[in-house]
C-alpha cells in the first residue's frame, strides 16, 4: 500500500523505531527527504520552495491540518518562499513508520500547491 494511503498509528514510548531494513524499504518512496540526526535523534527533513510568503504560510497550514487529522505533528520552519518540515516521533526519540507516512502525505500536499 502506498504511504499516502496509510494512516498513522498511536505511538507509545515502547514502540519500536524503524530498523535499517524498513528504512531501506520506505525511504525510496520519499526520495527527496534526508535523514538527519539532530541532538542524537534521527529525523526526516525536507526544504520546500514556494513563490512567496503567502504560499509558504498556506502550505504550512495545509501540512498542519493533515498533522492534526493524523495526530502526528512535525517541526515546521516557515520563511519567505520556504518551509522546512521535520518529522520524527517524539515518544521514541527516533523514526517510526508514521514519520514516513507523514512525509509522503507532505509530498502530496506539496504537489497539489506547486511546492518544490
Swiss-Prot record:
Question: What is one Pfam family matched by this protein?
Answer: Pterin_4a
Annotated GO biological process? tetrahydrobiopterin biosynthetic process
Q: Which GO terms describe its molecular function?
A: 4-alpha-hydroxytetrahydrobiopterin dehydratase activity
Top-level EC class as recorded in UniProt: lyase
Database matches in PANTHER family: PTERIN-4-ALPHA-CARBINOLAMINE DEHYDRATASE-RELATED
**Which keywords describe this protein according to UniProt?**
Lyase
SS bond partners: none
EC no. given is 4.2.1.96
* Superkingdom field: Bacteria
Key word Membrane present in the record?
no
Q: Keyword check for Lyase, yes or no.
A: yes
Q: What is the protein named? A: Putative pterin-4-alpha-carbinolamine dehydratase 1
| Catalysed conversion reaction | (4aS,6R)-4a-hydroxy-L-erythro-5,6,7,8-tetrahydrobiopterin = (6R)-L-erythro-6,7-dihydrobiopterin + H2O
Q: Which family does it belong to?
A: Belongs to the pterin-4-alpha-carbinolamine dehydratase family.
